[in-house]
Amino acid sequence: TVGTGIGGGVVVGGHTVHGLLHPEVGHMLLRPHPDDPIPHGVCPYHDGCLEGLAAGPAIGARVQGDARELPDDHPVFKIEAHYLAQMCQNLIVTVSPEKIILGGGVMQREGLFPLVRQETLRLLGGYVQSDRLLNHTDDYIVPPALYPVSGLWGAYLLGKKALENA
């Protein structure tokens, strides 16, 4: 999810991945966009992490206001796509997911999806030769199918699974 923060989960074989701690996708470190006025981001823990560069508060700091009022072609969204695409690229080469689902308040701006998909492919530089990724990117990097109640369904399923395992 991309909203006031950035959260991510990894599901393998129907089970969420949990090792030393839960995946902290939001704190992966990224390269700054050359036109970013806040290249270190707003995270109090890490300079240049995904959450500090791409969550809602970072977008607001970048435009010094409420980004919800901006037009889709505002340059801030190319910067946003640059950071989200780095996350996608990192996940593709490390986790090799079958699908990347991007939800949350920031991702309600549907114009971001084409920008993120295009930038992800550019960043991969032809390294990953997958038909699913190269020719069906619209079905690979997607919004949640159950939006706006996807979070509720996820919580329900986690609770149900916990009860079954108790």
Predicted regions and their residues:
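ATP-binding/phosphotransfer module of carbohydrate and carboxylate kinases, centering on a glycine-rich
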Residues: P32-A166
